[in-house]
Structures are given as structure tokens and as C-alpha cells.
């Protein structure tokens, strides 16, 4: 059994799983919206309260992993930690729990997510978009004979939290000018990335697959899914027309009304519009009329890679996680993980 913790810009997640033959066999997942990246785009700093929220959540995850009988644990951080000058403060707090926190580059995040997604698509050529809070990772390629082929991989600084903080008011209905600016920002970054020779010269993707809370929320909202059912959402598609309709609905509602929509987590309401704009622009630019959502995301890729390293096999991506024996992890909050003010 292996445990992996992914600390994202919006959400902190834990997966505890058995992995064999490069596939995740059994898994339990936990998720908590902590909004680590709030304000980072403007200040370049992690908010102290956000750091504490993440710390308390991770402490509970370490305890849960121990109770599940896990032998080793991996802890990674993504966009918000990459951007923040005070990310070491969070790193020290996590280290006090006995973890080895690793800030992974965007390109590695993209490759790990692709690895997680690809197990459901055989050898097909797919474009995977991991649209998170601070960034969107794009990876185009396939898996053939257990070898990952990725001719195109990019990490773009555009995500639901970044777009919201930069262009959209969290408490009010956005103006048409703000919406247009958000669309233009996302569109330009996507167009620049997809205009590169690596993408243009690669075999065209058969399918567009999206991971992350925005993608899964769009599927759930479109079906008015209550309660959330990952089995229903996984590998289900949504049309570009339905994404546009959901964006138009969200843009007309204040945050407190968005939070009441069936299929949407209340804590995700402040950033869902920004995330929807990002994915709509991606569909527009790539020309895909349908986007498939996947629950097999970065966590799956982390699990597969961690299992390979634990078993002494080569990592399937050009990166090795640091597996911390779980008996070295403390579990439960340390008495003084933060400096006194």
C-alpha cells in the first residue's frame, strides 16, 4: 500500500492504493478544498491562514494513511507552491509531520497526469489537460508497450484561481469587460502553446481528456448530479455547447447562488467560472466539440511512479518521488509547526 498527497492551488488530496503491474488496483481518495493559492497571483506569497489550513488537512491525511496500513507516503506540491516566495514556510510545516514535500515542475506534473489518464485509453493518441487552480498542464501523446511517448508537453500559468483573482470578482457578477479579458488571457496562452512546432508536427489527438475539479464539476453540474458520484463522472463527456451554457449560467449568478447549483461543491463556487472559461477556450482552440473528464489524474500517475520506485523499477517519467516510510511520519499536528507572531 502506498499513499500520495497532492497539494494543489485549490484542493489538497490523498490517495491510498494498491498498485501492481503499473496499474492502480484499489484506491481510497480524500479531498479537501483549502485554497492554498488565494492571492498568490497578486502577492507572490502564500497566505498564512491558507498554509495552516493545508497543514491541518495534511496532518489528518497522514493519520488516515497510517490507519489504512500504508507502508510509504509521497507528498507533492504544484502551481501555488511553485509561484510563492514563502513556499519554504509551508515546506517546513509539512516536514514537521515527517514528510518530504516535493515541489514538482509543471512539465513533470503534466507527464504524471498523462500517465494516470492514459491507462484508460490503450495506445490511442490523446491530449490531456490538467486544469487546476494556478496552471493548466497539457500533454499530447500515447502509451505503447508500456512506454510513454510525449512529443508535446506544456505547463501554462492559467487556472481557475489565477483567472478568478486576476479578472473576476468573487463576490459579484462579473462585467462583460472582465469576462472578455478572462477569455482573451486564457485564449492567448493556449494559442501560443498549441502554435509550437512540437504540437503542430505531432500526430493529431483523437480525444481531449480533462482532469481536475473544474472538469469533473462541469460533468456533475451538467447532469445535476447529487450527491457526487466519481463512477458516473469518470470518462463521461460534455459538449462545447453545454460548457458554454454552463459558463453563461455561472456568469449571471453571484457566488452564493452558484454554490446552490446541483453538482457543484460549495467551496468551489468562487472559482468555477474562471475554470470554465479556461476549458471552454481550450475546446475552442483545439477544435474538439466534446471533452471527456477523467478521475484518473495526477494522483494515479504519482501512485504508479511511486510503486515503480518502491519496487526498484525505473520511473516511467523522468522524475523520482521520495518515498517516506510511514513510520517516520508523525501524524497529527505538531505542537509548534509555525512561528509565533
Predicted regions and their residues:
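Short acidic/polar active-site loop segments enriched in Thr and Asp
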Residues: 10, 71, 289
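Helical "lid/coupling" subdomains associated with nucleotide-phosphate turnover
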Residues: 2, 16-19, 35, 39-68, ...
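N-terminal basic/disordered segments at the start of proteins
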Residues: 2-24
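Beta-strand initiation motifs
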Residues: 22-27, 146-151
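Short amphipathic
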Residues: 29-32
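Short beta-strand-to-turn element immediately C-terminal to the catalytic PLP-Schiff-base lysine
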Residues: 17-19, 139-142
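A generic, well-ordered mixed alpha/beta core segment in the N-terminal half of proteins
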Residues: 117, 125-140
Amino acid at each position: 500500500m502506498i499513499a500520495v498527497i497532492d497539494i494543489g492551488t485549490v484542493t489538497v488530496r490523498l490517495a491510498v492504493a494498491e498498485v501492481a503491474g503499473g496499474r492502480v488496483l484499489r484506491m481510497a481518495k480524500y479531498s479537501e478544498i483549502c485554497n492554498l493559492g488565494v492571492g498568490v497571483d497578486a502577492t507572490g506569497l502564500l497566505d498564512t491562514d491558507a498554509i495552516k489550513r493545508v497543514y491541518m488537512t495534511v496532518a489528518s491525511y497522514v493519520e488516515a494513511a497510517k490507519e489504512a496500513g500504508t507502508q510509504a507516503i509521497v507528498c507533492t506540491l504544484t502551481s501555488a507552491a511553485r509561484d510563492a516566495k514563502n513556499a519554504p514556510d509551508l515546506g517546513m510545516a509539512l516536514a514537521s509531520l515527517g514528510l518530504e514535500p516535493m515541489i514538482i515542475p509543471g512539465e513533470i506534473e503534466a507527464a504524471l497526469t498523462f500517465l494516470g489518464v492514459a491507462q484508460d485509453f490503450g495506445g490511442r493518441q490523446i491530449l490531456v489537460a490538467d486544469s487546476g487552480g494556478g496552471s493548466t498542464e497539457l500533454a499530447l501523446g500515447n502509451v505503447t508497450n508500456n512506454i510513454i511517448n510525449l512529443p508535446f508537453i506544456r505547463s501554462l500559468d492559467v487556472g481557475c484561481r489565477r483567472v478568478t483573482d486576476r479578472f473576476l470578482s468573487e463576490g459579484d457578477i462579473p462585467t462583460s469587460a472582465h469576462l472578455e479579458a478572462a477569455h482573451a488571457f486564457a485564449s492567448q496562452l493556449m494559442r501560443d502553446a498549441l502554435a509550437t512546432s512540437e504540437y503542430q508536427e505531432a500526430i493529431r489527438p483523437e480525444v481531449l481528456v480533462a482532469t481536475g475539479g473544474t472538469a469533473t464539476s462541469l460533468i456533475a453540474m451538467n447532469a445535476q448530479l447529487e450527491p457526487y458520484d466519481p463512477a458516473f463522472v469518470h470518462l463521461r463527456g460534455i459538449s462545447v455547447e453545454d460548457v458554454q451554457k454552463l459558463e453563461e449560467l455561472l456568469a449571471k449568478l453571484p457566488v452564493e447562488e452558484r454554490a446552490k447549483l446541483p453538482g457543484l461543491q460549495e467551496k468551489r463556487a468562487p472559482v468555477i467560472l474562471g475554470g470554465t472559461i479556461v476549458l471552454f477556450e481550450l475546446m475552442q482552440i483545439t477544435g474538439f466539440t466534446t471533452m471527456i473528464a477523467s478521475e484518473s489524474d495526477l494522483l494515479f500517475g504519482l501512485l504508479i511512479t511511486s510503486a515503480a520506485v518502491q519496487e526498484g523499477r525505473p520511473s516511467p517519467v523522468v522524475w523520482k518521488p521520495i518515498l517516506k516510510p510511514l513510520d517516520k511520519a508523525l501524524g497529527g499536528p505538531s505542537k509548534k509547526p509555525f512561528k509565533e507572531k
